[in-house]
A protein has these predicted regions:
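Short, surface-exposed interaction patches in beta-rich subdomains
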Residues: 68, 79-171
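Right-handed parallel beta-helix
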Residues: 1-67, 76-83, 96, 144-171
């Protein structure tokens, strides 16, 4: 049985920190909204993860999900060792994704900030499309805006108006 949990908080002082331990189970949906403050999520299993923040960085690590939808207005995004389709719509801040493999769909749109994707495994079934109005693009050490491997059933679309885009192998 999948669970949904709703928890609301409101603070008027600065530098408040909330830590919410959750039981080890698979959640149907996790939604996190914040006006101000950094959000860190780790070691969670959920079908759907949705994170919105007006001002603050978002960090997601070791999270298994079918779909991850992250929308910060002002702040960086860092995703490490997590699985599932990723949608990021960021107005200002860098985006960094470190994955073991690129076997999910990615749609990352960044108005102002760089996008950096690193993977340990060579992609075998992926199409990458990257565009930057003001910045450089490097995909696996080549100055190109496109990459194709295998049947291309998985897609990665990377866009930034102002910033560099890098997709590379990591150690």
């Amino acid at each position: 049985k999948k669970s949904n949990v709703n928890i609301g908080f409101s603070f008027s002082k600065e530098k408040n920190r909330i830590r919410i331990p959750v039981p080890k189970q698979i959640f149907g949906k996790i939604e996190i909204e914040s006006e101000l403050g950094d959000i860190t999520l780790g070691a969670v299993q959920t079908d759907s993860l949705s994170v919105f923040t007006e001002t603050g960085s978002v960090t997601v690590r070791e999270t298994q999900t079918k779909k991850m939808d992250i929308k910060p207005e002002l702040g960086s995004v860092k995703i490490t060792r997590s699985t599932g389709d990723i949608i990021i719509d960021n107005e200002m801040g860098n985006v960094e994704v470190a994955a073991d493999s690129l076997d999910h769909n990615f749609n990352i749109n960044n108005e102002m900030g760089s996008i950096h994707i690193s993977t340990k495994k060579e992609p075998s079934d992926l199409f990458i499309s990257a565009s930057s109005e003001m910045g450089s693009i490097r995909i696996f050490d080549k100055k190109t805006g496109a990459f194709r491997a295998g049947d291309q059933t998985k897609e990665m679309e990377l866009k930034t108006e102002m910033g560099n885009i890098t997709v590379e192998h990591s150690n």
